[in-house]
């Protein structure tokens, strides 16, 4: 009931799950919807999946009690296969302990595409938004075939298009701007830290 109400109140939340420590990290409760705003479903026990092989399970299991883990932004997968149409998500999870022992975790999948599209609409309409992860892999690109291409074996990165951005991502400079002869900004690049340590 609590998980269902959480999805009702947060339209961008796609899944709320309790994943146990036992049985290869099997989901014990999963409430989900296919897309933001779509109908909410409670998954039948026969369709619950083991998740111990996923990065977010291992990272969350290793955290201290009460410490939130934020996953990389990637495409949602079901049974190990990228879901179609593509569904970019970020996962927030927290471990559950009892008497000092790890018992499982609560995991929330959040649809991140609406946030990307909002960012693309703010500011000057003539600007084009590119978003990457820390490796320079595209999360959002004007050519949609390059967005999340790394999830399907693609190797095209921001360094291919804008080599100077490497100095921002490796931390050697805080930001990069390229100006035209008339002083107009042609390219602006900045790292925005986002992870569990940025939650305060």
Protein language model regions, located:
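Core beta-strand residues in small-molecule sensory/regulatory alpha/beta domains
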Residues: 19, 95-97, 132, 193-196
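Extracytoplasmic/periplasmic ligand-binding sensor regions of membrane-associated signaling proteins
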Residues: 33-110, 117-118
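Solvent-exposed, extracytoplasmic
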Residues: 2-9, 43, 79, 101, ...
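Short, surface-exposed beta-strand-loop junctions and turns on beta-sheet-rich folds
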Residues: 33-36, 145-148, 195
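Soluble or luminal CAZymes and related metallo-dependent hydrolases
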Residues: 1, 48, 52, 167-168
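Exposed loop/turn and edge beta-strand positions of beta-sandwich/beta-sheet ligand-binding modules
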Residues: 12, 85-90, 125, 183
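Short N-terminal helix-loop-first-beta-strand/juxtamembrane motif that initiates sensory/input modules
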Residues: 8-34, 51, 62-69, 120-140, ...
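Extracellular/periplasmic juxtamembrane segments that couple receptor/chemosensory ectodomains to their
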Residues: 101, 155-200
């Amino acid at each position: 009931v609590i998980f269902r109400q959480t999805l009702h109140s947060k339209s961008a939340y796609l899944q709320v799950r309790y994943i146990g420590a036992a049985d290869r990290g099997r989901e014990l409760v999963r409430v989900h919807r296919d897309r933001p705003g779509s109908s909410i479903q409670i998954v039948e026990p026969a369709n619950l999946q083991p998740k111990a092989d996923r990065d977010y399970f291992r990272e969350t299991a290793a955290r201290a009690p009460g410490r939130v883990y934020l996953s990389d932004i990637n495409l949602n997968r079901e049974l190990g296969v990228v879901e179609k149409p593509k569904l970019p998500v970020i996962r927030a999870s927290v471990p559950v302990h009892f008497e000092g022992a790890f018992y499982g975790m609560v995991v929330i999948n959040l649809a991140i595409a609406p946030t990307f599209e909002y960012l693309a609409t703010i500011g000057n309409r003539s600007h084009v938004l590119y978003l990457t992860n820390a490796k320079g892999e595209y999360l959002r690109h004007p050519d949609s075939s390059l967005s999340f291409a790394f999830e399907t074996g693609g190797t095209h990165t921001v360094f291919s298009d804008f080599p100077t951005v490497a100095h921002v991502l490796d931390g050697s400079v805080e930001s990069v701007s390229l100006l035209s002869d008339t002083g107009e900004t042609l390219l602006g690049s900045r790292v925005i830290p986002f992870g569990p340590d940025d939650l305060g």
